[in-house]
A protein has these predicted regions:
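Bacterial Sec-dependent N-terminal signal peptides
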Residues: 16-35
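Generic beta-sheet signal
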Residues: 38-40, 181-190, 287-289, 402-411
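Small-residue packing motifs within transmembrane alpha-helices
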Residues: 9-13, 17
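Bacterial N-terminal signal peptides that target proteins for export
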Residues: 1-9
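Active-site-proximal alpha-helix that buttresses catalytic centers in soluble enzyme cores
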Residues: 29-175, 195, 200-402, 416-480
Length: 480
């Protein structure tokens, strides 16, 4: 062989070794090291980037196949990337920062794609350990979309991701984790546009010279930026090669049933002209609203992480099958509403986003191809704040936008009694005392039904329930 050829091959080998040392993108099948700072990027599908067909084009939500992939991917992440290690942090897209279709539906795919994974981890709060982990979805300053309530206050420890990182809060979050040099596993869940831009910004800001993916290959591909204690960075690609079915997930076994006896029965009505009652101006007509509580979340009275626990995943996934029976003889939901999961707070030194109501009804909306909307124009605040009850009542029961609809609403249960009390009070024109309403702390099953007829006359009761017994629910999430 000529000396020039030998020299060229040696130079090529040297160049390749340098490239590898700078963190060339390589496919990996090995566990990530718990001695490194690991940033794991789960890429959720959206309408613009959905090569595997995981999104419903009408609702911009996951379809059954997308939900199945999310459930299966959770097990892959735990088994193939983390092993026995626990996650350190989970940051997901704030849904209201990415509105899709002409109906401006929020992007719920990112938190829906990572929820099952969160429940395969553990957290200890004030002495209680359970299978759950907070999802950070909160707004950073400057990222609150128009028309969305500004946090009061902002909760930096619960910061999520903005679809367009206009104020560079995404990159500040990621580089802050890297520069903190604390080993762990930090998961980011967002669409390809957000993930790709964030990887590029990290690469530039940190001077890594990594070879980045140039196109979206589908949500089977997971990217891991792993940084050693010495500062050497590598970008690894994991291909889960999942082939989920396009049918709704089937739980491993049937859940124990429950009767509708957790609350004392009540029923109230307000009819125009009866006992001096007048229907308030602007009241909706021909409307039914089902109020349900989020899934199981409190293994003890001092446990709070903004999410529900693994037992609650059984309820959330079962709703698609049990609600039709629970609502037999009643009108079926035509749309689903919940609280903006980006609303965040602190509890016992922990910063969390209030994701559990929306994630409780997300599977039901997916199974039934229903529009999923978030209430984001006001902060949910304290249940005892009369302004919150008024804002909630006005949103759901006045203005005509929800007339002629049957709405399934997942909310925080302590807000229900003040909400219903306020709504009844708006009809007062006679000698009606305030109702003595309450919702037991351990009740995750009861359904409150509010109906407005064609004239706006009101009836409310708590006769229905989902029919799922809480206590027998498994303490670990179903695995797929």
């Amino acid at each position: 062989m000529k000396k020039s050829s030998v020299g060229f091959l040696l130079l090529l080998a040297f160049a390749l070794s340098l490239f590898a040392g700078c963190g060339g993108d390589t496919e990996s099948t090995t566990l990530l090291s718990d001695k490194n700072v690991n940033l794991i990027f789960v890429v959720s599908p959206d309408l613009a980037n959905d090569p595997l067909g995981d999104v419903n084009p009408a609702t911009a939500n996951l379809n059954n196949q997308g939900l199945q992939r999310a459930l299966m991917l959770a097990s892959y992440l735990k088994q193939q990337l983390l092993g026995t290690n626990n996650v350190t942090g989970i940051h997901a897209l704030a849904p209201m920062t990415h509105l899709q279709t002409a109906n401006q539906f929020p992007d719920m795919a990112a938190i829906g794609f990572i929820q099952q994974f969160a429940l395969l981890n553990k957290i200890t709060i004030q002495g209680t350990t359970d299978n759950s982990y907070p999802l950070s979805v909160g707004y950073a300053e400057g990222d609150v979309p128009a028309g969305v309530a500004v946090p009061a206050p902002y909760v930096p420890g619960a910061q999520g991701l903005a679809f367009n990182d206009t104020h560079e809060n995404n990159i500040k979050l990621a580089t802050g984790i890297i520069n903190g040099k604390t080993p762990g596993f930090h998961v980011f869940s967002a669409p390809w546009e957000t993930t790709s831009a964030l990887l590029t910004a990290i690469n530039t800001t940190m001077g890594y010279h990594l070879r980045l993916p140039t196109s979206f290959q589908g949500s089977n591909h997971v990217y891991a930026l792993t940084v050693t204690p010495s500062g050497e960075a590598r970008l690894l690609t994991f291909d889960s090669k999942l082939t989920p079915p396009d049918t709704y997930p089937v739980l491993p076994f049937s859940l124990a049933s429950a009767s509708c006896t957790q609350q004392n029965f009540f029923s109230y009505s307000r009819t125009n002209g009866v006992n001096g009652v007048s229907v308030p101006a602007g009241t909706n007509t021909n409307q039914t609203v089902y109020l349900i509580r989020h899934a199981e979340a409190h293994p003890s009275s001092t446990f709070e992480d903004g999410n529900f626990v693994a037992a609650g995943q059984w309820r959330a996934l079962a709703l698609a099958n049990v609600l039709p029976n629970a609502l037999r003889g009643q009108s079926s939901p035509t749309m689903v509403y919940s609280i903006d999961p980006a609303q965040s707070f602190t509890y016992a030194g922990l910063s969390v986003s209030y994701v559990r109501p929306s994630l409780t009804v997300l599977p039901y909306a997916i199974a039934n191809n229903l529009p999923f909307n978030l209430v984001s124009s006001f902060n949910i605040g304290l249940a005892t704040d009369p302004g919150v009850a008024k804002a909630t009542s006005d949103f759901f029961f006045t203005g005509g936008a929800l007339s002629n609809q049957t709405v399934l609403v997942a909310w925080e249960h302590e807000h229900f009694p003040p909400l219903l009390t306020y709504l009844l009070q708006t009809y007062y024109g006679g000698n009606y005392p305030d109702p003595a309403l309450s919702w037991p702390h351990g009740d995750y099953d009861t359904i409150w039904t509010i109906k407005l007829d064609g004239s706006g006359n009101l009836t409310v009761d708590n006769a229905l329930c989902e029919g799922i017994a809480s206590i027998p629910l498994p303490k670990t999430a179903p695995e797929f």
